[in-house]
Amino acid sequence: MTHQDRLHSPALPDGSPFDLDNPAAYPAWREARLAAAPRTLDHLIVEIGDPRHLTEAEHAAILKRCARANMAIYVSTAGEDPDKSIPARLGERFGLCRLDHNRGADEDAITSLMVKDDARHRGYIPYTDRPIAWHTDGYYNDAEHQIHGLILHCVRPAEQGGDNALLDPEIAYIRVRDQGPDLIRALMHPECMTIPANPRELGGDQGGQGHPRPDRPGPVFSVAQDGHLHMRYTDRSRSIRWRDDPLTAAAVACLKSVLREPSPWRFQARLESGWGLICNNVLHTRTAFADGTAPRLLYRARYYDRIRGI
């Protein structure tokens, strides 16, 4: 690692499993992480009553799954209740409070995800019925506004499609690092992945300051101040610029291969009415979908916080 790279790297806590220059802690962390990781979708699911009023047992069950997989799927009795306090109150219970006022969000910073063709949303794929490739949310945000927590709450599913594939970023990290620590080093470079400037996004991701969003370079993998692994990624091929060197190219190819290949830790889920995903911004996709009489509606809440307690 060059001196310049070190200037851009976070100060890692002693004994961090993510310290490539002092890897002693990594093998034990890797073994424990893989041993704890669920291998079936059923192990992510928690049945609950009202998400706005979790019992202590429901809270503990969700937290346990998030500790093992950085995510949980709740199956609630809320049905098609359109109350936006459902994701808001649920998030607060897990320490998710600092909402990201992104460009497409509603006034309360919770986004109503459905097919929209107005000028504000036109051209942005989340508001279409098209498939969305692997990504973490808010990958275009600046370093001070990274998305660490995410809730997706389903009010109405599509008539067909709209499924999500899910993968814990820590599992993706392990599978790439197994192929060589230098690949991880490339993915942790501060200029590994750049999202080019977008003059259409005034103020972009944090509520709008009246300025076009500039280039946003940053790493794919980084370590947050609390010592947790953080991932920033999109599998799209347009509107993205990778660092131009052979090691980065090899690292990106390895990561894309990990995302393409089936594995015991990759899950496929379809959120039904009253169901939701609460997570530490895990990797996810969305299949194409077709609406019926009532359009698909999900609420998306993005947070600058991680889930508290894990």
Tell me what each language-model feature is.
Residues 69-78, 87:
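N-terminal, charged low-complexity regulatory/assembly segments
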Residues 91-100:
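A short alpha->loop->secondary-structure connector
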